[in-house]
């Protein structure tokens, strides 16, 4: 919860955690702020856990509801995901054809179901009781196979009570960082999530898959070869976490503008170069009929509006 709290500055509309321990897999989610999740955890205290995953979600596919919040559970797996899966519609049709019941409108639940189908099939093909280490290895293979089918940007984490104490993850384009501690290890979209516990971090590259335990981290490339991730020491402390290591919020916002533009466009530009804005629920014909734009803002947002005015009028030929 502390780690999720340090990522609040990014904005979100729901949150949740999944925990694995002797009692099995426990998922708790809530729409709204982290206080809502804390209340849900207080009302239903989870059993002691050996590992867990958590997520603060900003709605893309599906509205800001508890059902759409992460983690999503599918069979013996719980999954969190940061990013946008561009081909989730055909994957959703595949999942539904397989008889899976979907409880949300999200692309993440579709991925969780696809991953569980592959994971279950591989376990069944093994035909015998597997050790926890063998189960973890199967989940790594499933993660590699499934992420190879995904189009878009993602950082995916999965846990299972069949291999408690293990997190399997993969990334493409979306950020994912390893925190290397003493008798504990971490994963986060930003070092701010774990800098209070360790300042030693490692980089996860594109299309890499990893297996993390409290004592070890193993990373593979897309071809299944073990790689050694680059490591570094974080030079700032937890008090600076919300500022991303910058001296001021202004510095942070200035330097993050290119990343912010890229994140905004993730999954929203198709192969033809057209923008996809499904969550706005506005027909393209309506957008084409817009003949004037009014920017309402104050403070630094007003300055951004003044800059946007020149860009919009230049490229869209619409008065602002």
Residue ranges and their predicted role:
Residues 288-320:
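Glycine-rich phosphate-binding loops that contact phosphosugars or nucleotide phosphates
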């Amino acid at each position: 919860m502390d780690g999720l709290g340090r990522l609040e500055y990014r904005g979100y509309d729901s949150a949740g955690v999944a925990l694995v321990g002797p009692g099995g897999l426990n998922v708790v989610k809530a729409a709204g702020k982290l206080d809502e999740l804390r209340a849900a955890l207080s009302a239903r205290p989870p059993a002691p856990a050996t590992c867990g995953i958590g997520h603060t979600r900003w709605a893309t596919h599906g509205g800001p509801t508890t059902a759409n919040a992460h983690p999503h559970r599918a069979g013996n797996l719980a999954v969190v995901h940061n990013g946008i899966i561009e081909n989730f519609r055909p994957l959703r049709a595949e999942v539904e054809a397989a008889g899976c019941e979907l409880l949300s409108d999200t692309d993440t639940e579709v991925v969780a179901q696809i991953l569980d189908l592959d994971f279950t099939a591989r376990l069944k093909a093994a035909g015998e009781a597997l050790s926890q280490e063998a189960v973890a290895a199967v989940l790594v293979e499933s993660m590699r196979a499934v992420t190879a089918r995904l189009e878009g940007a993602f950082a995916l984490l999965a846990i299972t009570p069949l291999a408690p104490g293990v997190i399997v993850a993969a990334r493409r384009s979306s950020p994912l960082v390893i925190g290397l501690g003493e008798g504990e290890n971490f994963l986060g979209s930003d070092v701010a999530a774990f800098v209070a516990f360790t300042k030693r971090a490692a980089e996860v590259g594109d299309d890499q898959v990893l297996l993390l335990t409290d004592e070890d981290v193993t990373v593979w490339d897309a071809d299944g070869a073990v790689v050694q991730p680059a490591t570094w020491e974080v030079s700032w402390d937890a008090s600076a976490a919300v500022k991303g290591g910058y001296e001021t919020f202004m510095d942070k916002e200035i330097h993050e503008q290119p990343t912010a533009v890229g994140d905004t466009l993730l999954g929203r530009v198709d192969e033809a170069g057209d923008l996809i804005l499904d969550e706005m629920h506005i027909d393209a014909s309506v957008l084409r009929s817009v003949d004037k734009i009014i920017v309402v803002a104050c403070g630094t947002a007003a300055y951004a509006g003044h800059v946007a005015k020149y860009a919009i009028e230049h490229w869209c030929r619409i008065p602002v």
